[in-house]
Curated annotation (Swiss-Prot):
Spans within the Extracellular topological domain: 31-1454
Free-text description of this protein's post-translational modifications in UniProt: O-glycosylated; contains heparan sulfate. Heparan sulfate attachment is required for synapse development by mediating interactions with neuroligins and LRRTM2.
Regions annotated as coiled coil: none
Descriptive protein name: Neurexin-1
CDD domains, alphabetized: EGF_CA (cd00054), LamG (cd00110)
Residues that bind Ca(2+) 1: D345, L362, M430
Record: glycosylation sites: N125, N190, S705, N813, N1246, S1408
Ranges annotated as spanning the membrane: 1455-1475
Amino acid sequence: MGTALLQRGGCFLLCLSLLLLGCWAELGSGLEFPGAEGQWTRFPKWNACCESEMSFQLKTRSARGLVLYFDDEGFCDFLELILTRGGRLQLSFSIFCAEPATLLTDTPVNDGAWHNVRIRRQFRNTTLFIDQVEAKWVEVKSKRRDMTVFSGLFVGGLPPELRAAALKLTLASVREREPFKGWIRDVRVNSSLALPVDSGEVKLDDEPPNSGGGSPCEAGEEGEGGVCLNGGVCSVVDDQAVCDCSRTGFRGKDCSQEDNNVEGLAHLMMGDQGKSKEDNNVEGLAHLMMGDQGKEEYIATFKGSEYFCYDLSQNPIQSSSDEITLSFKTLQRNGLMLHTGKSADYVNLALKNGAVSLVINLGSGAFEALVEPVNGKFNDNAWHDVKVTRNLRQTSGIGHAMVNKLHCSVTISVDGILTTTGYTQEDYTMLGSDDFFYVGGSPSTADLPGSPVSNNFMGCLKEVVYKNNDVRLELSRLAKQGDPKMKIHGVVAFKCENVATLDPITFETPESFISLPKWNAKKTGSISFDFRTTEPNGLILFSHGKPRHQKDAKHPQMIKVDFFAIEMLDGHLYLLLDMGSGTIKIKALQKKVNDGEWYHVDFQRDGRSGTISVNTLRTPYTAPGESQILDLDDELYLGGLPENKAGLVFPTEVWTALLNYGYVGCIRDLFIDGQSKDIRQMAEVQSTAGVKPSCSRETAKPCLSNPCKNNGMCRDGWNRYVCDCSGTGYLGRSCEREATVLSYDGSMFMKIQLPVVMHTEAEDVSLRFRSQRAYGILMATTSRDSADTLRLELDAGRVKLTVNLDCIRINCNSSKGPETLFAGYNLNDNEWHTVRVVRRGKSLKLTVDDQQAMTGQMAGDHTRLEFHNIETGIITERRYLSSVPSNFIGHLQSLTFNGMAYIDLCKNGDIDYCELNARFGFRNIIADPVTFKTKSSYVALATLQAYTSMHLFFQFKTTSLDGLILYNSGDGNDFIVVELVKGYLHYVFDLGNGANLIKGSSNKPLNDNQWHNVMISRDTSNLHTVKIDTKITTQITAGARNLDLKSDLYIGGVAKETYKSLPKLVHAKEGFQGCLASVDLNGRLPDLISDALFCNGQIERGCEGPSTTCQEDSCSNQGVCLQQWDGISCDCSMTSFSGPLCNDPGTTYIFSKGGGQITYKWPPNDRPSTRADRLAIGFSTVQKEAVLVRVDSSSGLGDYLELHIHQGKIGVKFNVGTDDIAIEESNAIINDGKYHVVRFTRSGGNATLQVDSWPVIERYPAGNNDNERLAIARQRIPYRLGRVVDEWLLDKGRQLTIFNSQATIIIGGKEQGQPFQGQLSGLYYNGLKVLNMAAENDANIAIVGNVRLVGEVPSSMTTESTATAMQSEMSTSIMETTTTLATSTARRGKPPTKEPVSQTTDDILVASAECPSDDEDIDPCEPSSGGLANPTRAGGREPYPGSAEVIRESSSTTGMVVGIVAAAALCILILLYAMYKYRNRDEGSYHVDESRNYISNSAQSNGAVVKEKQPSSAKSANKNKKNKDKEYYV
C-alpha cells in the first residue's frame, strides 16, 4: 500500500502532500496510527469552552489507547478520550479543578469497522455520540461553567517533549496512556473540516487495509481493495455493507459509476478514473490524478481579501448582447462575485443576504433582479450555477405612429431552474466598459456603482466566463494561466478549499464588547454587518479621533473629536458622524428594528456624502461643513465600551455611550472596507466575557419565571430578563441586593466630583427619597463654569424638576430660561417615593412612583448639559444660582445617574471622587435640636411667610402638659398658634373669618419625653392638614384664603404679659419647656439661635433632656414615678408612705385600747359623687374583727364604703344603690402585728383589692354588653333624674355605678361597734390625705377617743408638692376613671408583683364655675378620656381559678310611686333620644396611614414608669378614649 510517512516537521510535509493529493478528507483519506511510541498528530486548538462540537470517524481493532486529548497547559481544565475496557470509549473532563466527570460507552468500537464519533460541549455538560445508536452525557460539578483551552487538539498520542514536561500537562496520567492504533479521518470542528498542523510517526492513507475478521465491509474477492470503491465510506447496516459515495464523485452501490453532477473537488476527475494494478499501489487521492482527465475546470478560492482584476483598457467591451456564466459555492450571505463598468454603464453580480443579485445599468437607469431559492439560501456550501444573458429585442410602440423600438431583454437563472427576466430601459442598449473586470471582489466594493454589498466574496468560484458576439473571456482560466492583463490580488488557491465561516456572536450583557483595530477611513470607507436583537437600546459601533480643543473663545474647554457611531435607541437605528465641521445624525429606517429578525446594515461614505442602508432601504446623507476627512485615532468598538473609559471622549450626540447602553444581541458578517472580520476569533483571543460564539433565540420568555425579586419590574430582553429595580430599594441583576440608604439632617451632603467635565444631551436619573419636609434639594448636577443644571427638589410637597441650559457662554439661540416640571403631591409623608427623569435632547419626562408621567419640551436649539458635579442634600456649587434650594432632611436611596448607582459606588469605594458627610444607613433624624430650659424662654424670628399656602414641620420632645410652641400675629385678627394643651397638640388660626381650632390626633398625650414629628400645612384651597407622627387630621375652611402675618414669629413662647391678650381659643398661659428640632418654616430652615432677632431665657443647642429619668426602682413601695423636664417626682398616694421617693413613713396614728375615731366631714355644698374611688392605708394590728375606714353618703341615701377586718382577713363592702357588694383577700392573714398596706379601687360596680404585694383580687359585676353605651348615655341625663333611672335600670338587672353625695369619712370604727386597735398610716382617699389633715388640725376633722399621733407630720414640702402636682393635672370629668393597680391576675400560681398606677385622677363629680350652679346637676362640661382602663373583664372570659364567684345583683326593688314611674318613662324617652343622637353623630373623618412607620422612637421612655393592663383593660380604655373631646347636651 502506498503511504506518505509524516515525520517531525510534518507541517510542511503534510501540507505538501495535501496540495499534491487534494483535500484529504474530501475523498475519505485518513490518518493511520501504527501504535508506535512517539506517534501523535496535532490539530488546531478546539475552543471547547462553551457550546461547540467536534466529530471524526474511527476504525480500530485495539482495545486500549489514547484517542484525543487537550487541556489548559497545566492548570485545571482538560478533556481526554481513550479506548479502554474491551474497546469501549471513555471520556473524562474537568473544569476549574473540579472532580473530573467520566462516562463510559456501552458499545465497543474495536470491531474493525468505521464508527462516527461526535463530542458536544455545552458548558458544564459534555455529550458523547457513537454512530446513531448511543449518546451519553455527563456534567462536572464546577463553580465555573466555561472550559479554558490553551493547547492544540492532540489525536492518537502526545509529542515526546510534551510527555516529558510534566508541568505542561493538566492530567498527569495521560503520559502513561498507550498510543492509539488504527485509522482516524474526517476530523471536523463545528461542521468545518480541521486539517492537521503537524505530526510524528503517522501515515496518510486513503483506505485502511483489511484486518480480517469477516466484516461485510472488508475485502471481497482476492485482489480487490474492499466493498466501496473510489474512496467510498462503508458502514454496516443490518449486517449488510452500505457505501456512502457522497464525497467521491461517483455513485452506485459500490461507488463505481461516474457522477456527471460532480461537486467539490470531483470535477477534477475526468476520463478513466478506475483503479489499475499497474499504479504501483498508489491509493488515496493520488489515483484520481491518473489517466485521461478530459477538460480541466478552473476553480479559485476567495477568502474575502482576494480578487481578480482583468484590464479592459486595451480592448474595451462594446456589446448589445452578452452572456455571463459562473458557478459558486459559499457559506457567506453577502459578497461581490463579478463587476465591470463604471459610472452609469456597468454590470454587477453579487450574493446578497443569501440571494443572487444582478444590477445592470446601460445609462438610462438600473435594472435590478434578485433571485431567491424557494427554501433556504444559496449560501449552503453547495455548488450553484448562474447564467446571465442580455439580448437585443425589437418591440412595437403604440402612439401617433407605429414605431419599432429596441430593448434589452435580461435573463438571470440559477441552477437552470430559478429564472428572472426583465428589460432595460429604451434608448440605451449597449454595454460599454473600458475599465476592469473584477471577479471575487474589488479594492473598494462599497464604492462600485450599483453595488448592493460592500464586502468581497468568500468561497469558491468556478468557470467565470464572459462572452459576447466578439469576445470570450474565460476569466478563471486567464487567472490561473497568468494572463498579463489579469492581475491577482492576494494569495489565491486554484482549487476549492473550505473557507472558515464568519460565525455569528452574541453579546449577552450590556458590558460585553470587542475591540477592533483602528479604522483608517479618512476619505472613503465602508462597513457592513448583520444584527439581530429584541432590545430597544444599544451602542453597536463607535470610534473617535484625537481630542482637540474648541476654537470658540467663549468655550475654550469644550473638546471636539471626529467620531463615527451606529446605535440603537428606542428600537430605531441611527448613524452618527462628525468629521470636524458638524455632526450628522440619521435615522436609518423609520420602522423599529428590534423585532428579533436579522437586519443587514451597509454603511458607505465618500468624503462628505454617503449612504446607510438597512436591508434594501437606502438612506443618503451629506455631512455639514467643508471637512471631508474622517480622522479616527482610537480602536473601533463593537457591541459596547470598556468599563475603564478614562481615555475615551464621548460626543454628546452619542446618547447610548453616555447612558451606558451596551448592545445585547447577535452580530454576524462584519466587513470593513470589504475585508471580512472574524469577530468570533477576536472574541476568543481577547477572552471577552459575555460574548458567546453562536446566535440562537430562546422561545421561552424569561420573565415568565418571575426572576425579579422584591417587586422589581421585569422586561424580556434578548435571551435574558431585565429588571427595573428603581422603585424597590434594591439593586443587582435580579433586585436581590439591598441598596444603601443615606441619611441627611439638613447639614449633610454627598458630592460626586467627576474626573472630567461632562457634556450630555440625554440623561436617565432615578432615586428614592423619604422625608417629612415639604422642601429640600434631592439631586442636582452643577458646573463650575456655567449655570447648567438638572435639579430635582421637593417644593411644597411636590417633586420639581428644573433643567437649565446656559446659552450665554456658547453660540446658541438664547433659551427662555429654565424648564420646570412638577409631579406628585403630599410627598412629605415620611414614606418612600421613587422619582424617575428621562431626557432625550429637548424632550423631558418626570415620573413619581406609579403616577402618570409629566412631559415637556425645552425651548431653543441648545440641548447640551454641562456639569462637573452631582450633588445631593446641599448644593455647594452656588456661583451661578439665583436662589439656593432648601437643604434636604430625610433619606435617599438608589440614586442612579446614567446607569451609575452612585450611593453604593461611593460606599463600596468603587469610585474615589466621592465626598460626603451624610451618614450611611437608615437613622432617625433630629436636625439642629435646641432646648428651651424654662417655660419663660423663647426666640423671635422674622415674620412667617405663609400668605397663600403654608408648610410647617418640626420635631419636639417634652414632659410638660402645656406650652406655647409657635405664635405669629398679623393684620386684623389674622394669627397662627401651635400649642400643647394637656399633652395634645392644638393648631389655632384665623384667616379673617374667625378663629378655628384643629386638634392633632394622637393615641396618647405627647408629653412622654419622646420625639414627635409634626407637619402642619395649608394649601391654596384652604385644606388644613395636621400630621402628628403617623396620624393625620384634615379640615377645610370656607371664606378668606390668605394668612396676612406682620409681626415677629415667636418660637417657644411669648413675653409674660402677652399671654393675657392671646386669642380666646388659645389655652397657653406659659411657654414650651423641652426640645425643638428640624424646624422648617415654609421651606426655610432657620437656626433658632443664630437667626433669632432676640432671645429670652435659657436656650441651648442640643437636647439632653432630663438629667434624671424614671427607672423601675425610682420610687419605693410601689410609688409611681412622674417624669419632669428638670427631674422626677414620686406619687406616693397609694403607698401609705411619703417623702421624695416614697420611702418615708406616712402620717401615723395609734388607736389605743377602748377605741378612738377620726372623722372628716365634707362641707354641705361640696359633697362629691363619684363613679370611681381609690383608697389606700397602712396598718398593723392583732385584732380579728375591726372597722378601719368607712365612707358614708348623706343621710337617707344609704351609699357607703367600708374597709374592715373579719376573722383576721381584710375586706371591703360597698353599696352604691343596690345590694351590698363585698370583696375580700381570703389568703392573707393580716392580724399578725406586722405592717401591711391595703389598696382598694372601685369603678362602678367593678372593684380591686390588694394587700401588700399579693396578687390583686378583682371583682366583676354581672351585666351585659350595653354597659358602656349606657354609661355614655347616662351622661346626658340630669342628675336630679339619675336616681330614678338607676332604679329603673335596677329592675332591668343593670348595675348602678355612682357613690352619691359622700358626706363623712370615719377612721377607727368606733361608731360601728368594732373599734380598731393598732396603728394606721398614710390614709389616702380620692385625693384626700385625711391623717395628714388631722395632724395639721384641719377644721373639717374631729378626733375623739384614744387616738395619738406618732412622731411629726411628714414634710409638707414633699407631700404637698406631690399633691399639688397631682391636683394641677387633674380633670373632673365624669368620664375619667381610675386605673387599676395591677393587671388581671390568676389567683393561684403567680408570684406577687409591684404594679405602679398611672398618673390619673379620681373620678370625683363636683360643681364647677363653668357648669350650672345646681349642686345636684352634675352634667359634665367637657367629657374626656382618662386613665388606662376600667377593670372590667373581657366578655366570655372564664373566671380565674380561686377567685371569688361573680355575684348577680337582685332585681327586686321597693314599690314605685306613680310619679316616679312617670318620671322614669320620661327618662326612657330622653335616653333613647340620646342614644340615637350618639349613634348618628358626625365625628368628621380623616385618613390615617399606619402601614409604614420608618422613623421609630427606639429609645426607651424615660417618663413615668407605668405598666398597662392586659388586653381586657386596654380595650375598655380605647373605647373610652374615642369619645374624648365630644360634648353632649340634653
